[in-house]
């Protein structure tokens, strides 16, 4: 029988300045904290926060996900962040507000939503 592999405790990195990436789609919100080079420090999603189905896309679910990711980033010493927002979802503002309320100093906010220059054909309109 093979011996169980010994894994050391997760080391704490001290990263005072980072970037918060908020990807808000129509179905989910993903919040990722990285260092300035783009290496991931912490992340959370509204689906991973316990919300399923259509509740994942609510602003409250985005707020909970942002709080979870922010808590993990603060454990690694992060204090100042720039915010990059991508996507059309409803959780954009709520996630930004949650990051600010978690005690981070926000240095900049940029919208990096990709805009097609007449690229792919969009999905057909829903008839409900």
UniProtKB/Swiss-Prot annotation:
A single cellular component GO annotation: ribosome
Oligomer and partners: Part of the 30S ribosomal subunit. Interacts with proteins S7 and S18. Binds to IF-3.
UniProt keyword annotations, A-Z: Ribonucleoprotein, Ribosomal protein, RNA-binding, rRNA-binding
One Gene Ontology MF term: structural constituent of ribosome
NCBIfam families named in the record: PRK05309.1, uS11_bact
Protein name per Swiss-Prot or TrEMBL: Small ribosomal subunit protein uS11
Organism: Solidesulfovibrio magneticus (strain ATCC 700980 / DSM 13731 / RS-1)
One GO-annotated biological process of the protein: translation
Matches recorded under HAMAP family: Ribosomal_uS11 (MF_01310)
């Amino acid at each position: 029988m093979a011996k169980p592999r010994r894994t050391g405790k997760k080391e704490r990195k001290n990263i005072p300045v980072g970037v918060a990436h908020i990807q808000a789609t129509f179905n989910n919100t993903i919040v990722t904290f990285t260092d300035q080079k783009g290496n991931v420090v912490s992340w959370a999603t509204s689906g991973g926060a316990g919300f399923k189905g259509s509740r994942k896309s609510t602003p409250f679910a985005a707020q909970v996900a942002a709080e979870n990711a922010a808590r993990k980033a603060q454990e690694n010493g992060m204090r100042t962040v720039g915010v990059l927002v991508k996507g059309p979802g409803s959780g954009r503002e709520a996630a930004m507000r949650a990051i600010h309320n978690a005690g981070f100093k926000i240095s900049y906010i940029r919208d990096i939503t990709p805009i097609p220059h007449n690229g792919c054909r969009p999905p057909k309109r829903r008839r409900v």
